[in-house]
């Protein structure tokens, strides 16, 4: 048992030594490179598929908090609405004013055209200032594949 233990200790020591040397050939990152990595633009897609004004207000608050925390120049935000959530993008909805404020701040608020078609809605029914995507779920999946962070309040 003593020989086996000595062998395992030797293997572990070798593995640790090799791991410690793994970074020796890499150049150290300059202060500018480290700062650039830290200040990389954040990209966030927010899903809203509920008709509940409370959920919408939470999503809109999330977008505002991101902009305040990171700065509007440091973050791209898309808020994608589909399914029952699309109703809050209609003119005169309970959150219409908040949506206007949000789009004015630079957040892209996007309506799913598949849902609009299913609910027999057209662009004149919808709030001014919003955008449109053919499929909300496809937009969200595409953004996640591109490395965007995903939020669903």
Q: Language model features by range: what are they?
A:
Residues 1-9:
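N-terminal export leaders
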Residues 22-24:
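Bacterial signal peptide processing site
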Residues 48-60, 86-89:
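Short, glycine-rich nucleotide/cofactor-binding loops
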